[in-house]
Amino acid sequence: MDLDMTAHIGGVAYGSLHDGPGQRTVLWFAGCSIRCAGCVNPHLFAPDSGRSAPLREVGHVLMEGINRRDQGVTFVGGEPFDQPQALAELCEHVAQYWASWPNVPRLIVYSGYTFEQLKSRRNSDVERALNTADVLVDGPFVQKWADEDLGYRGSRNQRVIDLAETRSTGEVAMLDWDRPRIVIRRGQIISSPSISRRLGLAATSTRHCGELTPEPAAVSA
């Protein structure tokens, strides 16, 4: 990994159950050229949002997730593919140091670009990221297709793509992650906002998938 390269990072969270299967470390990339209407993180649109951090520092932040017994990593934004070189370096870092768990993707990347748009770039760093990640959740958030019960998607146009299977077969292979989720951890009930409202769970943790709330910390030395 090019340790001196910098990336614009919006924040990090550990122990997340909202951003993919298993207990995950989540890293928010700052800056987004797509700027979907209704995005849960509009404060990460600006290229200079978040802070600039060397990949050496970001790598240490990701390694802390292993110390906390997280099972996988999720990259969200902002738009991770707006920083393709930094994204590729960090994808390879995760692949090198994080173990594989049964039924838990090691690395999930969210993007407002479709898989086909990313492939059409013919960019070597984009290809490195796509060849390293396990799952890509692709496509822009579209308000008219929004559904809080989609699990790990925001709107119905978005796809959960099994990148390993796609690489193997040459055809886009999709996963079904849309089952409603209720998780109980250390006495706290964690679910989607719509399930919480229907069940009247006032004390529930209801962060939207991919949402950067005040709880995640900024990347710091």
Regions found by a protein language model. Give the residues of each.
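Conserved, mostly hydrophobic/aromatic
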Residues: L27, C36, E79, L136
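Short loop or secondary-structure boundary microenvironments that flank
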Residues: F29, G77-P80, I195
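Residues that scaffold the ATP/ADP-binding catalytic core of kinase and kinase-like folds
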Residues: R35-C39, L163
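N-terminal pre-triad scaffold of radical SAM enzymes
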Residues: A7-R35
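Conserved Radical SAM active-site core
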Residues: A7-G10, Q23, G38-R128
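Short low-complexity stretches enriched in small and charged residues
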Residues: V26-S33, A86-H93, D149
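Glycine-centered flexibility motif
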Residues: G20-G22, G31, G38, M63, ...
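Auxiliary Fe-S-binding modules of radical SAM enzymes
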Residues: D2-L17, I66, G112-Y113, K119-A221
